[in-house]
């Protein structure tokens, strides 16, 4: 088995991995969302993709994040990474997915669910207590993410439209 080395400014060390960097970063975004959910249970989540230089997750919550909050989120992420939590994929039919997201108050995810074609599979990934509407892929467990460093906070309009609510990124 050949292992590849990946390096990013968002990672404090080289990571030996069988996964593409995009997959590692996307998984890191999920772990960040799980950490935010632990610290701020009222958070509503939109999307959390990998980017050319790292990853982000857009969310809406009462608490306005400041730079000092990044340390607490990062600390919670490191604990989740250390627990080597599995990324478990499961499918749901549309009605059950709508019910679950509605009961959880995840209004942005409900809108994203509506974008999925009627005949498409609806997949979720569970990492610890965090469950996310997501097509993947992900690493097998959070321990395969390696070290992370959160660098900044930004704002982003839902769906990139200034008429929509400003989310935190």
Model feature map: region roles:
Residues 3-15:
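Short, Lys/Arg-enriched N-terminal segments with co-localized hydrophobic residues
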């Amino acid at each position: 088995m050949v292992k590849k080395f990946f390096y990013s400014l968002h990672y404090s060390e080289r990571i030996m991995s069988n996964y593409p960097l995009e997959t590692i970063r996307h998984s890191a975004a999920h772990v960040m969302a799980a950490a935010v959910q632990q610290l701020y249970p009222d958070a509503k989540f939109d999307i959390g993709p990998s980017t050319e230089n790292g990853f982000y997750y857009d969310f809406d919550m009462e608490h306005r994040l400041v730079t000092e909050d990044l340390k607490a989120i990062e600390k919670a992420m490191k604990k989740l990474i250390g627990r080597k939590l599995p990324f478990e994929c499961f499918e749901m039919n549309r009605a059950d997915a709508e019910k679950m997201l509605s009961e959880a108050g995840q209004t942005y995810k409900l809108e994203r669910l509506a974008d999925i074609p009627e005949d498409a599979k609806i997949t979720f990934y569970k990492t610890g207590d965090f469950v996310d509407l997501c097509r993947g892929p992900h690493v097998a467990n959070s321990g395969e993410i390696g070290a992370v460093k959160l660098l900044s906070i930004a704002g982003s309009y839902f769906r990139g439209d200034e008429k929509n609510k400003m989310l935190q990124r």
